[in-house]
Structures are given as C-alpha cells and as structure tokens.
C-alpha cells in the first residue's frame, strides 16, 4: 500500500522503524527552530522557511529532478535518508524495503500544493502509486478467475 507520511507521519514511521525522536530539537546547539512561526497569517506559518538538500539518486531527487529545494518548516536504519536541512535536521526519508511507494516528509507539501511545483510532483507520484496499487488489486481476482 502506498505511504506518503507528512510531518508527524514522518515521526510515526521513524518510530515504527525503530528510530528515536528528540522532542526539543530547537534546543540542540547548531539547530534551527523548525517550529511554526506564531502568526495569524497561514501564508507566514506555512511559507517557505529554508532549503533542503536532496540525497543524490534518492526518491526525492528522482521525483523532483533537483538537488536542493525550498520548503516550509513546522514541526531513521531501515529508512533511507532523502533530504536534510542545512542545519542537519532530517527532512525526508523513504523506506527502501517497502513493496511500493513509501516516502515520509517533515514539511507540509499539502499547503498550497497546486501553486508549488515540488508539491505537485510529490502528490502526482503518490497518486500514481495509489492508482497502480488499486489496478493491481482489481486485476488479481480477474487473473484468479481466468485460471
């Protein structure tokens, strides 16, 4: 089943795979405060906050065709590192052993997704994986009946 984990979803997948979380990462020396700004304007809260470096050859690098993209910020050994903020904060990972699409992001691509080419590529890839899984599940009974 395709998996596209966003924000806390990334954290949940990380823990499910045996990873740990640091609850107060903003208090770690050298780390940026990745929490949401306190603004009544969601365009400020969910606006682009920092760049992330994509791991060459990873799922995100292949999907987006870039090595560095700008993302918002509100806020893995069986996980494959996919993107890191310039302060070292993990921003994305994939699950290489998953039978299909399995990508976890720390940022929020759903905010104004139709206006953001990076978000659109991510959701297009997830939708394609969902369609492929649905097609395979629908085809299985037909194959069984034909045998």
PLM regions: where:
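Amide-donor transfer/coupling interface in amidating biosynthetic enzymes
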Residues: 1, 26, 30-147
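Catalytic nucleophile loop
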Residues: 1-20
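Short, surface-exposed, charged loop/turn segments at secondary-structure junctions
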Residues: 17-29
């Amino acid at each position: 089943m395709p998996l596209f984990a966003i924000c806390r979803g990334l954290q949940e997948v990380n823990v499910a795979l045996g990873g740990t979380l640091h609850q107060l990462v903003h208090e770690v020396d050298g780390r940026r405060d990745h929490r949401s700004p306190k603004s009544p304007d969601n365009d400020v809260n969910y606006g682009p906050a920092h760049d992330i470096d994509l791991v060459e050859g990873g799922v995100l690098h292949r999907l987006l065709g870039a090595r560095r993209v700008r993302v918002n910020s509100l806020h893995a050994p069986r996980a494959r590192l996919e993107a890191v903020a310039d302060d070292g904060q993990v921003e994305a990972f994939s699950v290489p052993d998953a039978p299909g699409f399995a990508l976890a992001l720390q940022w929020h691509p759903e905010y104004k997704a139709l206006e953001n080419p990076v978000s659109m590529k991510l959701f297009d890839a997830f939708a394609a994986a969902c369609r492929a899984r649905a097609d395979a599940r629908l085809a299985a009974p037909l194959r069984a009946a034909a045998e």
